[in-house]
Amino acid sequence: RAQGKYIFFFDSDDTLAPDTVKSIIDYFDTVYDEVDLVTYRITQYFKNAPPVYHFRYRTLTHTGVYDLDDPKNRFITQTNVNICVKNDKNNGIFFDESPGFRHEDEKYCCDILRRKMKIGFCQKGEYRYNRNNENSIVSTVFSPYYIFETSMAFYEELFNSFGGRVPPYFQGIVFNDLRWKLKEDKLLPYHYSPEEFARANRRI
């Protein structure tokens, strides 16, 4: 079990910029009572291609605390492990380890953020996401054959958990997932029968 004040997460084939840990900790200390999670820039690196940045950085333009109840922040959509969280042993929030779930990072962030509906962002530091691994989860099992039903069930459960109006931020979470899967042709379950495919489209 982690013993420090904060927890960082890190995938084995990714790297951090040298100043990342100190920069994030120094900033988190200044907003400790306001937020439970601080995010920082994630950059996708592909072989022989320019770095790719998520559209959330059109909103996250400066170091500070962002109100997730404000509709203009609905596309921050924190879904990856480029985060630092408090080492709170009593909050009861853990990664969902259900076999084949594939949304564990996203759900973990949602569970933490919905408590205060605020997120901290530090401009310093960088999570360097290696997209060159052809054997990664995203490259191998992030296809509708494996995750369409799981993804839909997760988002239906997420929306239902609000018992009515869904905050724009969480609507943005779903929009983000649909957007990138459509772009990479990983959304629609083409392997379904025509009847099942039509039903799946209505469900989306």
Model features per residue range: what roles?
Residues G164-P168, I173-I204:
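Terminal low-complexity segments of carbohydrate-biosynthetic enzymes
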Residues P99-F101, F121-A153, E184-A198:
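Nucleotide-sugar-dependent glycosyltransferase catalytic core
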Residues T15, D19-F55:
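Conserved donor NDP-sugar-binding/catalytic core segment of glycosyltransferases
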Residues I7:
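Short aromatic/hydrophobic "clamp" motif used to bind/position activated sugar donors
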Residues F101-Y108:
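Acidic donor-binding loop at a coil-to-helix junction in glycosyltransferase catalytic cores
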Residues Q3-G4, Q78-I93:
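Conserved nucleotide-sugar donor-binding
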Residues F10-S12, D96:
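Active-site acidic Asp-centered loop
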Residues H62-V85:
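A recurrent flexible, glycine/aromatic-enriched loop bordering the glycosyltransferase active site
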